[in-house]
Amino acid sequence: MALRHTISPQFSNRHSPPVTRSVSRTGVHQPLDTSTPVTRRDSQPGTITGTIQRFHESADDSEIDLNSSKFIYKEHFSYKEITSMKKEMWYDWLEYRIRMVRRRFVPTWAQFKRTLMAVVLFAMLYKYARDCLFDGTHHNSEGSYADKDANWASEKQKFHQTISNLRAEFSAHDKQLDFKTDHLEKLLENVLEHSKGWKESAIEELKQIKLWQAEISDALQQMKKEIDDAKSTKIIHSTPEKAPETAPTASLPPSSQLQPMHITRRALLGVNVANSLIGASIDHSCSSRPVSAKDGFFYDFMSYFGTFQEGYALLDRDVLSPGEAWCTYDKRATLTVKLARFVIPKSVSYQHVRWSGIVPNHAPKLYDVVACTDSCCTKWQPLVANCEYKERDGSYDEQEQFCSVPTIQNHSPINHVQFRFRENHGDMPKTCAYLIRVYGEPVDPPKETQPMTDNGTESKLESAIVNSVSETA
């Protein structure tokens, strides 16, 4: 029988057998085999022909099954191809088995749902059967629970005893609180009763004080009248007696007499109400901007942050030190002063630092004084005009020089004045005022501007004291 070899020398992994040709062992082509494959059905009587069998009919009339692996391996593949195909068949067989196992043992979603429902149904049946079975044994367990409760009876008794003790303590505390509250209520009632009595006594004392105040005011008015009468009588009797004694002073110029808008020598006409010691102050919002009394760029620059020296212009003192003054660079310098009391003005004065012979530079030379009728002196009334501060020829250097205010019968009381400096000595750009004074007779403030006090007696008493001081002066 001739051998069959593949046309290609390479191994073939195809499932269908390759095309072959008959070759002899010596390499000579053999004639085509006359055997032909025949396909036939098993046609035995009584059998079902469900399969088709293929047979190979050789020349010697022997039949070989074409479906057998032996025929395929022997007739169509070489030895090497057969061994390689066997190896591949082993791997294919293993893969096939794994797939079969997965198909059989790995459930699908439908199988999983059916299994889950079966498990849940089984669990429900088990629970129902267990409840039915162990229902009778529940009473026995209650007996065991009673035995366990008996063991904890002593501890329960202790717990209840502690609770009862706490309740007793709370009740005792409540009783103490009630007792203390009752005691405090009684004390409060007693205090209220005493306070009512104290209020009544205080009201009576206030009434007595008001009566005393009225008596004191009447007495003061009588004393004022007596003093005025005494002054008038003294002046009448003293003028003819002192006429010859005043002969040496006849050489004084007529400007030295006490007349309006003229300089006087020394005249104390009332109380200085422009004194910071009794409450007077500078109204900076309506005054010129203050600067340092010292000259220099540094002091001018620091004056923007405050000089702290301008208050000396209202500090009534005997000795004036250099530098303790209110100064400004304004050409029309204005100094607004809030007086300590409402007064009827009689005179004003100015005093510079100690000088001799010549008035120092920066000192005011010519100034006016007006009475402010509103808060910032936009409305005003003239008091003194053209008041001059200067040296005297051949006479004593007066450090404080006065200017009297003309007397007006219906002059209203004032508490704001403004000094308007028009000229200074030396024609310097800076004007410095060391000490200004405003003399007058303190009076009661107007009714529309009278401040309310605690008991209505403070302002009257203060005014009475100031009046008495002015009269004694």
UniProtKB/Swiss-Prot annotation:
Subcellular locations according to the entry: Nucleus membrane; Nucleus envelope
GO MF annotations, alphabetized: protein-membrane adaptor activity
Membrane association type: Single-pass membrane protein
Cellular component GO terms held in the UniProt record: meiotic nuclear membrane microtubule tethering complex; nuclear envelope; nuclear membrane
Domain SUN: 279-443
UniProtKB keywords: Coiled coil, Membrane, Nucleus, Transmembrane, Transmembrane helix
An annotated GO BP: regulation of centrosome duplication
Region Disordered: start-end pairs: 1-47, 237-257, 443-473
UniProt xrefs under Pfam families: Sad1_UNC (PF07738)
Bias type Polar residues, positions: 7-47, 248-257
Coiled-coil segments on the chain, per record: 163-191, 204-235
Summary of the knockout phenotype: RNAi-mediated knockdown disrupts both the localization of pot-1 and the anchoring of telomeres to the nuclear envelope in early embryos.
Coarse class of the protein's main subcellular location: nucleus
Cysteines engaged in disulfide bonds, as pairs: none
Transmembrane residue ranges: 262-282
Top-rank lineage group of the source organism: Eukaryota
Function per UniProt: Involved in centrosome attachment to the nucleus. Required for zyg-12 localization to the nuclear envelope. Together with pot-1, it is required to anchor telomeres to the nuclear envelope in embryos.
Domain notes: The SUN domain may play a role in nuclear anchoring.
Name of the protein described by the UniProt record: Sun domain-containing protein 1
Species the sequence originates in: Caenorhabditis elegans
